[in-house]
């Protein structure tokens, strides 16, 4: 009777061992990864709560690569956009800046020329009137150089962040075509100093048209040769213009 009950017990133990070894053999499938179509699940350990990825773990690189490409693409786009914007702004602002620079240079140059001529006369004359004029023109010349600096001409007071002027340009509200010389002439600082220079021109009876163009074209060749011969004969030396 004892042996009759022993065989079922052995049979049951054998069955349990077979089932257990079958479960252990399935663990080796993860070495090579799951099939492409199989889903991946997270298995949590009941002791410490750690998470282990099941199935093919290579798919976790896709979000990282996607984020990397998006970041690099954004940077490339910003870099290219900046380059195009800077070039476009330079192309649009160069013409206006050149016109402003020429007119400001003319103002500074005329004042410097008048101041230099008066300084020569003041040094040679004992009349205090020339000394007073030299002091006045010196202050005027210094003020012009200070107020017509680049950072002041292009200050936020006169220009917006988009590069558009804030001051009123004649004819703009009427819908007329406004060109760069019109904008430059309407600039408050340049308008002020061009007016002051015009007063000095009238004060000293200057003829600016005489200084324009080529002097060789204004004086015939025969007269130029004759004038040079007279200078050599008299031994004269050319000096600065003295008013």
Swiss-Prot record:
Cell compartment(s), UniProt: Cytoplasm; Nucleus
Family stated for the protein in its record: Belongs to the YAE1 family.
Transmembrane regions: none
Gene Ontology CC, one term: nucleus
Biological role stated in the UniProt entry: The complex LTO1:YAE1 may function as a target specific adapter that probably recruits apo-RPLI1 to the cytosolic iron-sulfur protein assembly (CIA) complex machinery. May be required for biogenesis of the large ribosomal subunit and initiation of translation.
Source organism (scientific name): Sclerotinia sclerotiorum (strain ATCC 18683 / 1980 / Ss-1) (White mold)
Name of the protein: Protein yae1
GO biological process: protein maturation
Superkingdom assignment: Eukaryota
Segments for region (deca-GX3 motif): 73-113
Keywords associated with the record: Cytoplasm, Nucleus
UniProt subunit comment: May form a complex with LTO1.
InterPro entries referenced in this protein's UniProt entry, alphabetically: Essential_protein_Yae1_N, Yae1-like
Region: Disordered, residue numbers: 36-60
């Amino acid at each position: 009777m004892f042996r009759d009950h022993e065989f079922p017990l052995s049979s049951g133990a054998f069955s349990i061992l077979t089932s257990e070894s079958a479960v252990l053999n399935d663990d080796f499938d993860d070495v090579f990864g799951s099939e492409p179509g199989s889903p991946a699940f997270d298995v949590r350990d009941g002791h410490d709560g750690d998470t282990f990825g099941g199935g093919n773990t290579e798919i976790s690189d896709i979000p990282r690569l996607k984020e990397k490409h998006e970041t690099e693409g954004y940077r490339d786009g910003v870099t290219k956009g900046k380059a195009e914007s800077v070039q476009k702004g330079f192309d649009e602002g160069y013409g206006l800046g050149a016109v402003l620079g020429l007119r400001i240079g003319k103002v500074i140059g005329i004042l410097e020329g008048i101041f230099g001529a008066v300084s020569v006369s003041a040094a040679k004359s004992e009349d205090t009137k020339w000394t007073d004029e030299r002091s006045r023109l010196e202050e005027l010349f210094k003020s012009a150089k200070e107020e017509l600096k680049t950072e002041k001409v292009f200050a936020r007071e006169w220009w917006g962040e988009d590069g558009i002027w804030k001051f009123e340009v004649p004819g703009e509200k009427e819908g007329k075509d406004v060109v760069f010389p019109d904008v430059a002439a309407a600039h408050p600082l340049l308008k002020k100093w061009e007016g002051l220079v015009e007063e000095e021109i009238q004060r000293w009876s200057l003829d600016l048209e005489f200084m324009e163009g080529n002097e060789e074209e204004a004086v015939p060749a025969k007269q130029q040769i004759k004038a040079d011969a007279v200078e050599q004969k008299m031994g004269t030396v050319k000096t600065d213009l003295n008013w």
